[in-house]
Amino acid sequence: MLEYYDDDAYVYDDDDEDAPITAEDSWTVISAFFREKGLVSQQLDSFNQFINYTIQDLILEDSTLILEQLAQHTTEADNISRKYEISFGKIYLAKPSMTESDGVSHAMYPQEARLRNLTYASGLFVEIKKRTYEAVDIPGRDLKYEIIQEESEDTEEGKIFIGRVPIMLRSKYCLLDDLSESDLYRLKECPFDMGGYFIINGSEKVLIAQERSAGNIVQVFKKSAPSPISHIAEIRSALEKGSRFISTLQVKLYGREGSTSRTIKATLPYIKQDIPIVIIFRALGIIPDGEILEHICYDQNDWQMLEMLKPCVEEGFVIQDRETALDFIGRRGTALGIKKEKRIQYAKDILQKEFLPHITQLEGFESRKAFFLGYMINRLLLCALDRKDQDDRDHFGKKRLDLAGPLLAQLFKTLFRKLTRDILRFMQRSVEEAKDFNLKLAVKATTITAGLKYALATGNWGEQKKAMSSRAGVSQVLNRYTYSSTLSHLRRTNTPIGRDGKLAKPRQLHNTHWGLVCPAETPEGQACGLVKNLSLMSCISVGTDPVPIITFLNEWGMEPLEDYVPHQSPDATRVFVNGVWHGIHRNPARLVDTIRKLRRKGDITAEVSIVRDIREKELKIFTDAGRVYRPLFVVADTQHADGHKDLKVRKGHIRKLMLTEYQDIEGGFEDEDINYTWTSLLNDGIVEYIDAEEEETILIAMQQEDLDPSVPQTVDPSDELDPARRIKAIHHSNTFTHCEIHPSMILGVAASVIPFPDHNQSPRNTYQSAMGKQAMGVFLTNYNVRMDTMANILYYPQKPLGTTRAMEYLKFRELPAGQNAIVAIACYSGYNQEDSMIMNQSSIDSGLFRSLFFRSYMDQEKRIGMSITESFEKPHRTNTLRMKHGTYEKLDDDGLIAPGVRVSGDDIIIGKTTPIPPDAEELGQRTAFHSKRDASTPLRSTENGIVDQVLITTNQEGLKFVKVRVRTTKVPQIGDKFASRHGQKGTIGITYRREDMPFTAEGVVPDLIINPHAIPSRMTVAHLIECLLSKVAALSGNEGDASPFTDITVDGISKLLREHGYQSRGFEVMYNGHTGKKLMAQIFFGPTYYQRLRHMVDDKIHARARGPMQVLTRQPVEGRSRDGGLRFGEMERDCMIAHGAAAFLKERLMEASDAFRVHICGICGLMTVVAKLKHNQFECRGCKNKIDIYQVHIPYAAKLLFQELMAMNIAPRLYTDRSRDF
């Protein structure tokens, strides 16, 4: 329980290679998985796929630009037509590099990009060929073109630069890929940094996986009462590669249950009305009624379904041939007033290109599309006849996650289109003006560079012009607060539904989420359940080409759809690949077995999913990108005599894995070179990837013991009955096909840190998952060479005493975020009520929970106009306008502050001036001497510290650029926030010195005292078990294993604690620190891991007397950073009204805010009085009134409102009680 490995873990007696594996061995498999995949493999694989294949595909898709220049026939000789053609070929990607302002290029490493605010990107080059054709244009004959010249561009074998693509760190094209640890140290990179993000203008950006519904699947839904449609079947067809161009087809069943004519109509794209389905079938060339019904209803004896189709056949009775049907559809098109032939062609085009485009967009596949439409109607009717439930929108197998690859592909496609359009325009201009066509000038490389950069920098995914329509928040700044918060951010997924939607369904945890997304880690509040996090072992498919699989199916007895005659083969199974119905098969069981064998051998990619629905007689194969899958152990088919089955994985495999791992660490043994990795397991068919769809066709055992039916039933009589032991469910089945590698792998990054999460009430784990991301620790080991905007580093981080096995892969022991505090659970003076706690001041003085805080300030000399720039210098009052009120004395002459200088609020740390253009007046403050204006950066007014580091460099334009880092030590004090790993957060209520704290008989004094009332209502039992286990761990000198779903019991831990001579449940006798008397009750006492959270009282404290005012309303400004006021809001106002405290109310809302004096005319009641206060003369010119004038005090905001109303021709007249009656 406490020790992970014996000392001789790698030394085996030569026992049976074929022995079954133990629970410990499954962790070896998990280690192999993470050693090969890492925690951000989904990001890296997706990006690699994009660079390796997608870009080339997208460029070849739009590869040829053609421009024809027809003969003008102005003179006899002018009868030559020309055709210009430009075609794109192979692409080349350079290494990430940068070009300095003086034109020198060099390789760029990520750290340089971060410090100099550059973009880590690689140049993209493409081969471009130009061809020119000519033809003699003889009227009445077709043109015959001949090539007259063909040239590749000579620049380096015809490679043209078309833009820079940002490179994901640690991907295949990153300079850090496959570097050793020492190389990384040399480049000032942290070896723990896992990559998976981009560097754009110096800031680290992650692409959050975007969840969407999968395309190309038929879904049937019921519609609720007021709608005339009772059921609807819909499919969102999307072409496999490229544009994600989506065309939706809906088949609607009109008429509610029990109504007479329940017709079925379909909504076609670009057609204004719904078209009866029989007409669509006839337009597809299927004329006889019987044949149409055959396409829909596969069983000719199913009279119920045929009965439902009767009204449809009757409805389409009028139209009996293909032409008429096509004309019927064409008439309802968007284009009006066109001839019949045109209409028919229009309808044909729509049926070919827009109707079910995912099947094909070529002509001659009408039969396939007809069968598919029939299948949709069949599904619709099955649901209407209550033989099948409606589809579940929230089924995770019907969702796809778009990662960096698909997201960038979508963007790249748009930008490349734009680029080709520009080239075409340039060609046209060149041809018209008979200029030389220069490719270098035609290709605007900034289109792609700037487009990708903009999307990644702002998170608005789409073109800059259409910023409103595009999705926001796709790219986010990587959270660098703690190492685990970074990891968690890289594995986050987002569902783009409106956050304000009150729909509960998409937010709920669904059964199909098991093992794929974490059940605990989701934010509270408006994004709850919409933002999810991947479980530790889940991966996302990158998408593979379905063609080999389709070829294989055709060879293995799949009959093509065109030859399918339903009534002849009623038992045939329909075969779908990526939602396209390709054909039927008569022996599906054998086919599925064969494909599975191929997949387990590695002949078919492991990420392909194979789903056989026996009841529906369907076989679905998915190879598309964005499916979430996870690995499982495969159970061997052979059944033993006693009915149990074995896992395919045996002790021998585990040994090979361990030897490989040992080689990696120790350098291995000379004699044998074993390289047995996770991939080897996959290719040996020992583990298998299963996605949410396929998971429903298999049976998964939770532990290895479940496979053996003889184990749970027989209770060993020698065991004394342990009341605390976990109760195992008795299985009534032994047809398992798979087994979980370990159930704790259902959790995500943040929840894997929680000890015993299976002993907590579920929302507590969710709270901790959110708080763990705010804990201080060491976010990366190279924090000293980074200039982050903000960074918090704990002085003495400790690894927890109660650990989970998953922490190994989260590197939590190497980069922890907390300390093991000695905690007593007691009231003791009552300064820990309501989630506050008492902390030991002496421990704080020794450095408990101290932290460093770094903040960086950045500035650069900007260009103004062509020649003039701002300059860093120490401004002088003599020649500089608008100087700030902080002190400039700490600056050196170059305008920068030296490291080691102590600074406090509002001190200037970067001095900079801007030249004033000679014609500017500067509000009359300017004298002859003033030639510049101050543009310096002061320290934040509420902070102080020591200047830690100053960096001077130049940016891409070659302008001077500085970053200054200020360092502060934050010592825990009253009001700072802490939390255990169970959602038990609290602030310090008081600190006592050691002599005032209670102590145990051994003289141990706690660091923290928390209130016992924090435990019962919150049911965080794991908090107590962790404390108990940590106590044992501290006494025995081992780490305590607090992983979820193990056989560890409180009794087991209590026994161990007893053996160390302590009270078995962790209680101790304590003495009052003030009086020395024994405390009445025994106190629960032991170490618990606590985290210091980022909310500190020094960053929150705020008060104000008088201060800055808003310009428009003259009310106090808002916000602590601007020294703003405290809002007396509507609710506070209501309380004052309820109390009847009128004078106080007037003081708060007027005197303390924006009191203002106006003069009003007693006659007209308007504020039109001209007041000369010096001479005591007043006059309302409109009324010629000089005597009847009153002075009133009203809020300035009210005066403003009155004036704005007057601007809208509404006259608010103010009357005093002394003005005359109107």
Curated annotation (Swiss-Prot):
Signal peptide: none annotated. Coiled coil: none annotated. Its main location: nucleus. It is found in: Nucleus. Transmembrane segments: none annotated. Zn(2+) binds at C1161, C1164, C1180, C1183. A zinc finger (C4-type) spans 1161-1183. SUPFAM superfamilies: beta and beta-prime subunits of DNA dependent RNA-polymerase. The keyword Manganese does not apply. Component of the RNA polymerase II (Pol II) complex consisting of 12 subunits. Keywords: DNA-directed RNA polymerase, Magnesium, Metal-binding, Nucleotidyltransferase, Nucleus, Transcription, Transferase, Zinc, Zinc-finger. It catalyses: RNA(n) + a ribonucleoside 5'-triphosphate = RNA(n+1) + diphosphate. DNA-dependent RNA polymerase catalyzes the transcription of DNA into RNA using the four ribonucleoside triphosphates as substrates. Second largest component of RNA polymerase II which synthesizes mRNA precursors and many functional non-coding RNAs. Proposed to contribute to the polymerase catalytic activity and forms the polymerase active center together with the largest subunit. Pol II is the central component of the basal RNA polymerase II transcription machinery. It is composed of mobile elements that move relative to each other. Its EC number is 2.7.7.6. It comes from the Eukaryota. Mg(2+) binds at D835. GO terms for cellular component: mitochondrion; pericentric heterochromatin; RNA polymerase II, core complex. This is DNA-directed RNA polymerase II subunit RPB2. The binding of ribonucleoside triphosphate to the RNA polymerase II transcribing complex probably involves a two-step mechanism. The initial binding seems to occur at the entry (E) site and involves a magnesium ion coordinated by three conserved aspartate residues of the two largest RNA Pol II subunits. One of its GO terms (biological process) is siRNA-mediated pericentric heterochromatin formation. Belongs to the RNA polymerase beta chain family. The keyword Transferase applies. It is an enzyme of class 2 (transferase). GO terms for molecular function: DNA binding; DNA-directed RNA polymerase activity; ribonucleoside binding; RNA binding; RNA-directed RNA polymerase activity; zinc ion binding. The gene is RPB2.
